[in-house]
From Swiss-Prot:
CDD domains for the chain: ProRS-INS, ProRS_anticodon_short, ProRS_core_prok
One BP term from GO: prolyl-tRNA aminoacylation
Record-given protein name: Proline--tRNA ligase
Homology family: Belongs to the class-II aminoacyl-tRNA synthetase family. ProS type 1 subfamily.
Subunit structure: Homodimer.
Subcellular location: Cytoplasm
Species assigned in the record: Staphylococcus aureus (strain MSSA476)
Gene behind the chain: proS
Length: 567
């Protein structure tokens, strides 16, 4: 394709709010253009990359007998009400109303819709298992879209849904998908690591995320250097081994602590280590207030709270709610309280006595507070995030951290949707049973960004061969010169029989062409310049920067060999 005919609006400067390298490079190289916050158009080069990614995805889905369909993005509220997610999903669900007053959602996911499609069709165990997938735009009303395609309000996904008669069948498909995802990410050029994860709003009993390692990743991966253990930090268990720091029990004392609001400020004020301070936070669980205690150097993990209480309806109490409840602001909270409120404490709070806590009065704290004498803990549990260097739950060693971008996730849903939506089949005994389900997602547009995050240098993108928008970049330095133009035209015709070629025939300066070529990042560059009359051209590899002069008689052989050896 001639570059003069392709819309590639490269930029010299990018908006300052473009933080991620992938966002900056996708804008700068003319692959995407922002419409509004979190919404982008995919321009010709990006569209070609997306087509290459989806071709690989389709191949791997068909390899495991997953069948492609296409469902509507617009979903009626009644389906979401059946599953209970219309009210539970939260503000991220994009809702709208038609002219007749009917409620709809622009789908962030399609569990309800696909269940409604199959529930009156998959009637017998003989029709199972069945796996369906689609590739489609999804929608999520992100509060703060950021990092370009990594956290947008409209995005492209591959989502698959499987239906089974028994758990063994689900296990097999889950494993098939897990392996297919591993192959997909390897083929598209991403270093992705599967990690144990939380199922979030989708639900289910078992799930893995596939994380593309990246410094700008919004998720923290906890992993072992001694085993294959890897988990999202939200899911990583903290091993509790008692390590008591007890001292002689002292009388309870109330002290003035002016302008002290954080655990670290309190530790500094008292001249004590922050891990000897106990923080108190108030949450609402299904509308009921509870207190949660952790030590000063630990942070409460609300995902673990949701898992512990078995509900997604958990939120941190607002400042106004806290003041109305206890008469003090959040920085002054403590468990010594004359109100009926359940108190939950992280396991590691048990290692301390003579606690330092808030007095439920602004400007004051209590010291020498002791469980059993001054207050009672209803239950202890693992309610916090793991720290780097702590022991891992598999016993393999200690926790190490890395950042990652979630590019895919696989879920065992069980009967969460089939039971609520009455999707049943007859088993081999003729009894009605709820369909057992799995769901499996890949962020296609996220994958595009993740590829760029992991495959770039100071000059631009470096596309892996499997997804590159074009195989070769043919550049005529000066098309006004007959010998250069004629040789470039001839090479373009020849190479087009075997490769996808982007032919830079523009009337631009050589520096502009070379800068754009580096920015766009095609794997191999062929430059027709001042030695065209001798039949000599330059061949350059984008990844290594290695270049050599080659006579046109040998050019096809050289290019073919280099291309075959590309990653």
């Amino acid at each position: 394709m001639k570059q003069s005919k392709v819309f590639i609006p490269t930029m010299r400067d990018v908006p300052s709010e473009a933080e991620a390298q992938s966002h900056r490079l996708l804008l700068k190289s003319g692959l995407i253009k922002q419409s509004t916050s979190g919404i982008y158009s995919y321009l010709p080069l990006a569209t070609r990359v997306l087509n290459n990614i989806t071709a690989i995805v389709r191949q791997e889905m068909e390899r495991i007998d997953s069948v492609e369909i296409l469902m509507p993005a617009l979903q009626q509220a009644e389906l979401w009400e059946e599953s209970g997610r219309w009210g539970a999903y939260g503000p991220e669900l994009m809702r709208l109303q038609d002219r007749h007053g009917r409620q709809f959602a622009l789908g962030p996911t399609h569990e309800e819709l696909v269940t409604s499609i199959v529930r009156n069709e998959l009637k017998s165990y003989k029709q199972l298992p069945m796996t369906l997938f689609q590739i489609q735009s999804k929608f999520r009303d992100e509060k703060r879209p950021r990092f370009g395609l990594l956290r947008g309000r409209e995005f492209i996904m591959k989502d698959a849904y499987s239906f089974h008669a028994d758990e063994a069948s689900l296990d097999q498909t889950y494993q098939d998908m897990y392996q297919a995802y591993s192959r997909i990410f390897e083929r598209v050029g991403i270093n992705a690591r599967p990690v144990v994860a939380d199922s979030g709003a989708i639900g289910g009993s078992h799930t893995h995320e596939f994380m593309a390692l990246s410094a700008i990743g919004e998720d923290t991966i906890v992993y072992s250097k001694e085993s294959d253990y890897a988990a999202n930090i939200e899911k990583a268990e903290v091993v509790y081994e008692p390590n008591h720091k007890y001292s002689t029990v002292q009388p309870l004392e109330k002290i003035e602590t002016p302008n002290v609001k954080t655990a670290q400020e309190l530790a500094d004020f008292l001249g004590r280590p922050v891990d000897e301070i106990v923080k108190t936070m108030i949450f609402k669980v299904d509308g009921e207030y509870i207190m949660v205690l952790v030590r000063g150097h630990h942070e409460i993990n609300d995902i673990k709270l949701k898992s512990y209480f078995g509900t997604d309806n958990i939120e941190l109490a607002t400042q106004d709610e806290i003041v109305n409840l206890v008469g003090a602001n959040p920085g002054s909270l403590g468990p010594v309280i004359d109100k009926e409120i359940k108190i939950y404490a992280d396991n590691f709070v048990q290692d301390l006595n003579n606690l330092v806590v808030g007095a439920n009065e602004d400007g004051y704290h209590l010291i020498n507070v002791n469980v059993g004498r001054d207050f009672n803990v209803d239950e202890y549990g693992d309610f916090r995030f793991i720290l780097e260097g702590e022991k891992l739950s598999d016993g393999s060693g200690v926790a190490h951290f890395a950042e990652g971008i979630e590019v895919g996730q696989v879920f065992k849903l069980g009967t969460k949707y089939s039971e609520s939506m009455n999707a049943t089949f007859l088993d081999n005994q003729g009894k009605a049973q709820p369909l057992i389900m799995g769901c499996y997602g890949i962020g296609i547009s996220r994958t595009l960004s993740a590829i760029v995050e992991q495959n770039h240098d100071d000059n631009g993108i470096v596309w892996p061969k499997s997804v590159t928008p074009f195989d070769l970049h043919l550049i005529s330095i000066n098309p006004k010169k007959d010998d250069q133009r004629e040789l470039a035209d001839a090479l373009y015709a020849e190479f087009n029989t075997k490769f996808d070629v982007l032919y830079d025939d523009r009337q631009e300066r050589a520096g502009v062409k070379f800068n754009d070529a580096d920015l766009i990042g095609l794997p191999l560059r062929i430059v027709v310049g001042k030695r065209a009359s001798e039949g000599i051209v330059e061949v350059k590899e984008r990844l290594t920067g290695d270049s050599e002069e080659v006579h046109i008689d040998d050019l096809m052989t050289v290019i073919t060999n280099k291309y075959d050896n590309l990653k």
